[in-house]
Regions:
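SAM-dependent Rossmann-like transferase core, predominantly class I methyltransferases
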Residues: 1-42
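General small-molecule cofactor/ligand-binding pocket signal
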Residues: 16, 95-97, 168-170
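Conserved SAM/SAH cofactor-binding pocket of Class I
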Residues: 29-107, 113-116
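A short SAM/SAH-binding and catalytic strip from SAM-dependent methyltransferases
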Residues: 112-125
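A short glycine-rich, Lys/Arg-flanked "PGG" loop and its adjoining helix->strand segment in the class I
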Residues: 128-140
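Conserved beta-strand signature within the Rossmann-like core of class I S-adenosyl-L-methionine
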Residues: 141-149
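Conserved class I S-adenosyl-L-methionine
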Residues: 149-165
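Core SAM-dependent methyltransferase catalytic element
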Residues: 172-184
Length: 184
């Protein structure tokens, strides 16, 4: 196992990860950049789509103490480490679940905040399905924040606009773009 401590939004988190999970030795630039642009509300109920070892959902759980936070990933190894990291950091309002996209998420669950570091290697069809499923699982006024590699930014803008009717590019860096869509 790989252990490290890293500050997220000015406060430390303790992580355990392993080889074979995305960015095992330190938090990836894309996720850190995304977290700088998310507007957390104390009572948000969030979902971290493709959580890896957990940083987005863990941060939501800490920043939004009155809400419940679900972290999902289709990789069972990532899910085990995300569970461990939530326990280790005493995040009792976070739950981690194995799910390919929204497939195994309770149908009646509604979220006010969706966060994702979309994997560059998933297909565009896959991304589009995630957006449709997310839309259906979001309450009115909910926000969907995503970080993608710059090569996917036009695709994200088109897809968010088709599914949500809006798309707001919050930041474009050298490598990554942060995009937000809001459900009416």
């Amino acid at each position: 196992d790989i252990q490290f401590t890293q500050d997220v939004l000015g406060k430390p988190f303790h992580f355990t990860s392993t080889w074979g999970i995305f960015s095992p030795e330190k938090l990836d630039e894309g996720s850190l950049m995304l977290l700088d642009y998310i507007e957390f509300k104390a009572d948000d109920h969030s979902i971290d789509l493709g959580c890896g070892y957990g940083v987005l959902g863990m941060t939501a759980a800490r920043e939004c103490p009155n809400g419940q936070h679900l972290l999902i990933d289709k990789d069972f190894v990532a899910v085990e480490y995300a569970k461990l990291n939530c326990q280790k950091n005493h995040l009792n309002n976070a739950q981690v679940q194995l799910s390919n996209g929204f497939r195994d998420v309770e149908k009646d669950k509604k979220f006010s905040l969706v966060m994702s570091n979309l994997p560059a290697k998933a297909s565009k069809e896959q991304h589009y399905l995630y957006l449709l499923d997310a839309y259906n699982a979001m309450e009115s006024g909910a926000r969907f924040y995503v970080v993608t590699i710059n090569g996917l930014r036009d695709f994200m803008k088109r897809s968010f606009t088709e599914v949500f009717g809006n798309s707001d590019k919050l930041k474009q860096g050298k490598t990554y773009t942060i995009t937000l869509a809001v459900k009416d």
